[in-house]
C-alpha cells in the first residue's frame, strides 16, 4: 500500500507544469534577454518539471510580435496570444492566466525588472506546501524618480486605510501561484481590473520575497505619471466606497456649518438687533465661499460619476480582450 502511494506521489511530481506569463507592449529589445534568462531557469531546474512560456502581445507597435513568433518557432514550450489592439496590462495578465495550463503559474514583466533568478526560490517555497502564493516585493526604489516614489508610497498608505484588504507597499505583479489561486482570480471577471487588489482580495497563504529595485534591461517604461495616476484612481474606486462616504461626511459638515452661520446672523440681526454694513464688506468672503462649495459639489459629482461609470462599463458585458492570433496548444 505504501509503495502504491509513493508511486502515485511520484506521478504527481512528474505531471507538474509551470506556466510563466509575460505581458508585452513594445518590448522587442527586452524579450531576447528575458527569454535567455527564462531558459536558464528551465535548464537549472533539477526537478521533474515542465515549463511553458506564455507571451501576451498587448497590441505592440514595434516588432514584438515577430520576436515572439520566432521564439515559438524554435521552442515548443513558447505559447503566445496577440491582442487585436492595446487592451492594457491588466487584460494581458488575465488572458495569460486563462491560457495557462500549469500547476504553478507566474506573472512577470518583460523588461526584467522582475528578476527571473527568484523563480527557483519561489518554486521551492510552493513545493513546501506552506504557501499558496509567493509574491515579489521591492524594498527599494533605486533608479526611480523621487516624486514618483513619493506618490507611490502615499498611494499605498491611502488605499490601505480605505480598503478592507491590505496591499503591500512595493508589491509587484510578479508572483508564483498555485492553480487554485489562479482559478479564484479568474472567477473575478471584472472589466475594469486592478490586479494588485484582486490578488489581495482572494486571500490564500502568501509569502513575500523581497528584492532590490532593478532597472529595465532595455527600452523605456510605458507607465507615465498620468497613467499611474489613473491606475491609482481605478484601484481606489474598484475596492472601496470610502470616497463616497467622505463626500457624505463633508456634505453633513458644510450643511451644519452653513446652518450655524445662518443662525449666528439671525440672532445678531433679529434678536440683538445689531445692524451693520457687513453685507457690503462681506461680499468677497461670500463669493469665495460660494466658489468653494461649488467646487466641492462638482468634485462629489465626479466621484459619483466614477462609480456610475464603472457600473455602466460592467453592464455592457464587453469582453476583457479580443485576440487576433493565438498559438496552438
Model-derived segments and their meaning:
Residues 10-144:
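Structured catalytic core of nucleotide-sugar glycosyltransferases
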Residues 2-3:
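Polybasic, lysine-rich low-complexity intrinsically disordered segments
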Residues 85, 110-112, 190, 211, ...:
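Short, conserved catalytic or interaction motifs in soluble domains
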Residues 50-51, 134-135, 167-170, 194, ...:
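Short, hydrophobic secondary-structure boundary micro-motifs
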Residues 70, 83-85, 89-99, 104, ...:
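Acceptor/aglycone-binding surface of glycosyltransferases and processive sugar-polymer synthases
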Residues 20, 38, 96, 111, ...:
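Residue-level signature of catalytic and energy-coupling elements of molecular machines
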Residues 11-15, 196-329:
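Hydrophobic helical membrane-anchoring modules
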Amino acid at each position: 500500500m505504501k509503495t502504491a502511494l509513493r508511486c502515485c506521489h511520484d506521478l504527481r511530481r512528474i505531471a507538474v507544469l509551470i506556466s510563466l506569463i509575460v505581458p508585452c507592449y513594445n518590448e522587442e529589445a527586452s524579450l531576447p534577454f528575458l527569454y535567455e534568462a527564462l531558459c536558464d531557469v528551465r535548464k537549472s531546474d533539477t526537478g521533474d518539471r515542465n515549463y511553458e512560456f506564455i507571451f501576451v502581445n498587448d497590441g505592440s507597435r514595434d516588432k514584438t510580435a515577430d520576436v515572439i513568433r520566432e521564439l515559438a518557432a524554435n521552442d515548443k514550450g513558447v505559447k503566445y496570444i496577440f491582442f487585436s489592439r492595446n487592451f492594457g496590462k491588466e487584460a494581458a495578465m488575465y488572458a495569460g492566466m486563462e491560457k495557462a495550463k500549469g500547476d504553478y503559474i507566474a506573472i512577470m514583466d518583460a523588461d526584467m525588472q522582475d528578476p527571473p533568478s527568484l523563480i527557483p526560490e519561489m518554486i521551492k517555497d510552493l513545493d513546501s506546501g506552506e504557501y499558496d502564493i509567493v509574491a515579489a516585493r521591492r524594498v527599494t526604489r533605486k533608479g526611480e524618480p523621487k516624486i514618483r516614489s513619493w506618490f507611490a508610497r502615499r498611494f499605498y498608505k491611502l488605499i490601505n486605510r480605505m480598503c478592507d484588504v491590505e496591499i503591500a507597499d512595493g508589491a509587484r505583479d510578479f508572483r508564483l501561484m498555485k492553480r487554485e489561486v489562479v482559478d479564484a482570480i479568474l472567477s473575478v471577471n471584472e472589466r475594469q481590473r486592478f490586479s494588485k487588489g484582486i490578488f489581495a482580495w482572494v486571500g490564500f497563504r502568501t509569502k513575500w520575497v523581497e528584492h532590490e529595485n532593478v532597472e529595465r534591461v532595455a527600452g523605456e517604461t510605458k507607465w507615465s505619471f498620468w497613467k499611474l495616476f489613473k491606475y491609482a484612481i481605478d484601484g481606489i474606486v474598484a475596492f472601496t466606497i470610502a470616497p463616497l462616504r467622505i463626500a457624505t461626511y463633508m456634505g453633513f459638515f458644510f450643511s451644519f456649518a452653513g446652518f450655524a452661520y445662518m443662525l449666528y446672523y439671525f440672532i445678531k440681526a433679529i434678536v440683538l438687533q445689531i445692524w451693520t454694513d457687513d453685507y457690503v464688506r462681506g461680499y468677497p468672503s461670500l463669493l469665495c465661499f460660494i466658489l468653494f462649495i461649488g467646487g466641492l459639489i462638482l468634485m462629489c459629482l465626479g466621484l459619483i460619476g466614477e462609480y456610475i461609470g464603472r457600473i455602466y462599463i460592467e453592464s455592457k458585458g464587453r469582453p476583457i480582450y479580443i485576440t487576433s492570433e493565438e498559438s496552438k496548444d
